[in-house]
Amino acid sequence: MDMEGKGNAEEASRLFLQAWNEATNDFEKYIAAYFVARHQDNVPDKLKWLETALQFALNVNNEAVVSAFPGLYLKIAKCYEDLGDVDNAKKNFELANSFSGDPSDKGPFYHGTKADLQVGDLLTPGGSSNYQPELIMNHIYFTALVNGAGLAAALAKGDRHERVYVVEPTGSFENDPNVTDKKFPGNPTRSYRSQAPLKIVGEVTDWVRQTPEQLQTWREKLAISRGEIIN
């Protein structure tokens, strides 16, 4: 992916194919096939790899992949459309639409911060962004991955200790558009946001901490992406 980001498509294609050949489980094969598909020069080959990615995603069929189904079916539909196969294009467009809607993830969910809060407190939108202090956030963000919440806590503004709270949404929520279908297909980080409050129902203390070097790398990446937050 680093090669792809640097515009070295040929080397990126070679490495993605190597990842496919070395994949050891269905999730790895799904991800690798998806990226191999992106580097195909013709529609039939692109379609073949997209359908391969879809099959392995269907084999996995958990919350790490279901958010990718709309995009996968849509890309497959467009391939069939380009090939003049109206029936298969229509079928896959309909399948893409069938997976739209609110996420089905049941949690548990976590929110990382440096704020000192208590069980029963409500987290609400309207605070300033951890990454762009001048930006007032219209949503409250959370994740189903405790280590992701731990990273958010480490990157949060303030000098207090990192805290990861177990939270329950009090209203509907959506996939975080800042990460969904961006670097990876769908929302494998299970990152969400809501305009409704989150209720704190507990706290966890056990998650994988980032090293100072890793945190600095994250801060540098966030500095580069300033101005790109979808609010």
Task: Show where each model-derived region lies.
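Conserved small-residue packing positions in alpha-helical repeats and bundles
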Residues: M1, Y34-A37, A77
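Alpha-helical segment of the N-proximal tetratricopeptide repeat
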Residues: M1-R14
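Residue-level detector of the short coil/turn that links helix A to helix B
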Residues: G7, D41-P44, G84
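Flexible helix-coil transition and linker loops at the boundaries of alpha-helical arrays
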Residues: Q18-D26, A57-S67
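TPR repeat positional signature
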Residues: Y30-A33, Y73
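Conserved NAD+-utilizing ADP-ribose enzyme module
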Residues: E81-D82, D87-G107, G112-K114, N130, ...
